[in-house]
Amino acid sequence: MTFLRVVKNKAYFRRFQVKFRRRREGKTDYYARRRLVAQDKNKYDSPKYRLVVRLTNKRVICQIVSSTLVGDKVHASADSSELVHYGVKVGLTNYAAAYCTGLLLARRLLTKLKLDSQFVGKVEADGELYHVEEEDNERRPFKALLDVGIKNVTTGNRVFGALKGACDGGLHVPHSEKRFPGYSVDDENNGSYDAQAHRDRIFGTHVANYMEYLKEEDPEKYKRQFSAYLKLGLDSESLEDMYAKAHENIRKNPVLPTKPKRKLKHVREGSKVLTSKGSYVRNVKISKAQRRERVKQKISLLVNES
C-alpha cells in the first residue's frame, strides 16, 4: 500500500464538509442519537423515550426525554442534589447516589403518570437482575432507552447505577448484567455475575471499606478526606442504614413540595435603588416619546434665546 499525501489545495477546501457544531465540540454523538430518536414508521405519533444520565463534578442528573421536531421535551427529571431532602447529604456523586437518583426519577415519573401503585418495582435492593416487563400487569410498563451521551460505558460505571435505580423503581429499560459491578469474565470467556458485589456498591459498602482502611493507615488523611461525613456524625457502619432510609423515603414521597413564589419588592424610589447595603443612583430610562419631547423643548429654548 502506497502512502498518499493529502494535498490541501483549492479543490480540497471547496469540497470539505464540516461536521455538526455539537459533534465538533464533542457534545453529541449523532451516530447514537439518530438510532435513539428514530421511531418505527408504523408507530404514528408515539414518542420514543430516553433515560438521559449525565455526570458532573458535583451532581448526577437523570431525565426522561422525548424528541420532537421543535426540540427535546423533558417529562421528568431528578438531581442528586435533591437527595439532601431524603437523608443523603454527602457523597452526591458516587455509585450509591447515582442509584438513588435513578430510583427518584422512576418513582417521580410513575407518580406523575399515576402508575406508581401499579408498578412498584423492587422494594429491597439486592443487586439481582430485575425486569418489570416480566411481571403480569394489566398494562405495559413505561419503556425508555438508556442515553449515555459520549460517556465511556465501562463495566461498573455510575451511569449503570442510575439505570439500575430506574429499573428497580418500576421503569422498563432494556439491559443486561454485563455492565454492572460484579460481572466478570474468566479465561475461557465465560461470564459470571455476583449480585452481592453489586449490592455492596448500591449501599456504599466500598466507601465504608475505604473509610475503615484509611482510618487505620492514615488518620490525618481520613479526617481531611471524610471531614463532611464526620461533621454529620457518619462513619463506616452507618452508611448502609443511611442509603436504606433514603430508598424508603424516596418511595414515600418522590415529589418535592413546590416553594411559594416570593413577592416582588419595589426597591426603586425615583432614580434611587435601595439595596441591603445602601442605595445608589440609576437614572430611569426614558421612552422615545419623552426623548422627542425633550428635543423639542431644547429647540424651542434655543429659538427663544436667539
UniProtKB/Swiss-Prot annotation:
Subunit-structure text: Component of the large ribosomal subunit (LSU).
Pfam families: Ribosomal_L18_c, Ribosomal_L5e
Record's keyword terms, sorted: Cytoplasm, Nucleus, Ribonucleoprotein, Ribosomal protein, RNA-binding, rRNA-binding
Transmembrane segments: none
Organism (species): Theileria parva
Protein name as it appears in the record: Large ribosomal subunit protein uL18
GO molecular function: 5S rRNA binding; structural constituent of ribosome
Localization of this protein: Cytoplasm; Nucleus
SUPFAM superfamilies for this protein: Translational machinery components
GO biological process: ribosomal large subunit assembly; translation
Superkingdom of this protein's organism: Eukaryota
Family: Belongs to the universal ribosomal protein uL18 family.
A GO CC term assigned to this protein in UniProt: nucleus
Chief location category: cytoplasm
Transport as UniProt keyword: no
